[in-house]
A protein has these predicted regions:
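Short beta-strand-to-loop capping motifs
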Residues: 7-11, 49-57
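Ordered hydrophobic segments in well-structured contexts
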Residues: 2-6, 50, 82-84
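Short, glycine- and small/hydrophobic-rich beta-strand elements in well-ordered beta-sheets
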Residues: 31-52
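Charged, low-complexity, helix/coiled-coil-prone segments
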Residues: 1-13, 97-104
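Long, contiguous binding/interaction regions
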Residues: 3-7, 13-26, 30-32
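Long, continuous compositionally biased terminal/linker segments
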Residues: 54-104
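Conserved aromatic-histidine-acidic binding/catalytic patches
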Residues: 17, 21, 43, 55
Length: 104
């Protein structure tokens, strides 16, 4: 595994806003990465999601596309607490919300 995308959703805000069902939101996020057959690394919290490459040449682009599709969706930034891009090749972690700007 060379690359990972890590997402943390503010579940309390999702519940308090009462616009989206948290479980449906998490399933939507999962499906964004499943469409490219990317691996999900299970965590002990439903609002903490991690997706990784499977070592295929196309996975880098698929991870990036899925992450940016979420970033530019109309609801994601309102509820995202963390969005990290992990690069195990050069051992770096990028805070995407700070790099691109959290527009909420």
């Amino acid at each position: 595994m060379k690359y990972k995308v890590e997402i943390v959703i503010d579940e309390e805000k999702v519940i308090n806003d009462d616009i989206y069902e948290p479980s449906e939101m998490y399933e939507f996020i999962r499906n964004m990465f499943k469409r490219f057959d990317l691996a999900e690394i299970k965590t002990d919290k439903p609002y903490h999601l991690i997706f990784a490459d499977k070592g295929r040449n196309r996975d880098y682009g698929a991870l990036g596309k899925s992450m940016l599709d979420l970033y530019y969706s109309d609801w994601f930034l309102k509820y995202a607490k963390k969005l990290f891009w992990h690069n195990n090749v050069n051992e770096s972690v990028e805070d995407v919300l700070n790099q691109l700007g959290n527009k909420t």
